[in-house]
Amino acid sequence: VSNWLPSATLKRPGEMRLISYQAAAHGADTVMFFQMRQSMASCEKFHGAIIQHVGNDENRVFRECAQLGTELKKIGDATLGSMAKPKTAILYDWNNRWAIEGSSGLSLDIDYPEEALQYYRPLFDANIDVDVIGMQEDLSRYQLVIAPELYMVKPGVKDSLEQFVRNGGTLVLSLYCGITNENDQVVCGGYPGELRELAGIWTEEFDALKN
């Protein structure tokens, strides 16, 4: 099983089994693989597969997948429908990402996915379960909500965040928040737009540090 990265290093022996059980432990009802048979041509011909170019079952990948299947069959449906219930959530929104990436004038170093990962990584390393949810989802069951680069504020989000904080939740905002509405139009009256009262700040100017 290969990663599909600039350097496609193989997963170490037992690593696939480990991350498969990790997924199941976090609520996954199925573990699926792409692809069954390795392609013979085109750009993905070296992409990992269960059945490799050799065409038989005499390789580590096939054996490890077969072992996992045997083990999961023994477990059966005992874990189906089980769910982890984290108390921490990170808001991540694709429209927000596209709007940030489509804007010019501040800094090309603004990186929405990386900003989210900077919050996720230490939580993961500390074994703190985290849900990654859309900005318009229900926040009532969380104790901590992190909203990295909440540049776009969709309808209902302001009220939802304010209610979450009033109910005792802890909200973490980062740079570049509250700038536009759901149509990527700047909310006039001062940054951070609809989140001014919630954040308790008014941003007069933006500036960017050079690398």
Q: Where on the chain are the PLM-derived regions?
A:
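Carbohydrate-binding surfaces of carbohydrate-active enzymes
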Residues: 1-211
